[in-house]
């Protein structure tokens, strides 16, 4: 089989959360460029509409849905809207997330803890659950891709809530994978390292960012397109026998032992 056929997503319907900016936008582009109909879900309607028009301008199918990923009713309606437009979601990319303020663990408030865990963990589980239920009911095979982080493997000061959530996403991925594999629904995760986005570009270009870059064996930060390979592998038939895995895309940062 040719590589172009192996990674072809024609006939698939993909839903991407956090699609209005950063990595989410790139995930939408990569999925659409390889044949999937895409549903863009986020809270910023104007950004979603602009991306939808961009995707449609390439003769790809897209629908924009304004929804809060922590609102289970809103997300159920989002899945309904996608089904009405394109059919059952067969690819879910659980990308929406937030970072915490740089607060030491003993200073994290209950409000911030619950906010970070609510978006970065709870929403991942419940939206995966919703997608899986619908795939099973429709008799569809599918792929759920959860976005974790290298902070799911190691921690840094001031990241307690975020690191806990991202580590739990990896275990959630494994738990769901074991229970859904028998029906042909694969569940995997991607753990990005430091990627330059509109949210963190000023920080990563600062002196502090330069120090982080020096600790990356490949000597650079990730670019948004650097995640396309992992995404398409897990979304397509190229990854048909992969489930419960977490692919680390970090330029070698996690494996390095500082001496």
Language-model features, listed with the residues they occupy:
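Short C-terminal tail/terminal secondary-structure segment
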Residues: 1-5, 99-102, 154, 232, ...
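Conserved glycine-rich cofactor-binding loop
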Residues: 13, 20-21
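C-terminal substrate-recognition "lid" of short-chain dehydrogenase/reductases
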Residues: 87, 220-249, 254
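Substrate-binding pocket helix/loop in short-chain dehydrogenase/reductase
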Residues: 103-105, 109-117, 212
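Active-site helix of classical SDR
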Residues: 128, 165, 173
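Alpha-helical segment proximal to the catalytic Tyr-Lys
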Residues: 133, 178-182, 240
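Residue(s) in the substrate-gating loop at a strand-loop-helix junction
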Residues: 149
């Amino acid at each position: 089989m040719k590589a172009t056929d192996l990674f072809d997503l024609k006939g698939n319907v993909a839903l991407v959360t956090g699609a209005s900016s950063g990595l989410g936008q790139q995930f939408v582009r990569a999925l659409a460029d390889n044949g999937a109909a895409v549903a863009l879900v986020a809270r910023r309607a104007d950004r979603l509409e602009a991306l939808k028009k961009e995707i449609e301008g390439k003769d790809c199918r897209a629908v924009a849905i304004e929804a809060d990923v922590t609102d289970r009713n809103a997300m159920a309606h989002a899945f309904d809207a996608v089904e009405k437009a394109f059919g059952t979601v067969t690819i879910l990319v659980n990308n929406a997330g937030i970072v915490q303020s740089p607060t030491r663990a003993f200073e994290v408030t209950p409000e911030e803890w619950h906010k970070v865990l609510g978006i970065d963990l709870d929403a991942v589980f419940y939206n995966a659950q919703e997608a899986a239920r619908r795939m099973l009911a429709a008799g569809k095979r599918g792929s759920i891709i959860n976005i974790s982080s290298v902070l799911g493997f190691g921690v840094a000061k001031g990241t307690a809530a975020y690191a806990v959530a991202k580590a739990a996403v990896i275990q959630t991925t494994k738990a769901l994978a074991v229970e859904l594999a028998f029906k042909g629904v694969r569940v995997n995760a991607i753990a990005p390292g430091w990627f330059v986005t509109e949210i963190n570009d000023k920080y990563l270009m600062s002196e502090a960012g330069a120090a982080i870059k020096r600790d990356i064996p490949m000597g650079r930060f990730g670019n948004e397109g650097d995640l396309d390979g992992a995404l398409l592998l897990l979304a397509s038939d190229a990854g048909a026998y992969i489930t419960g895995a977490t692919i680390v895309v970090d330029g070698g940062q996690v494996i390095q032992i500082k001496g």
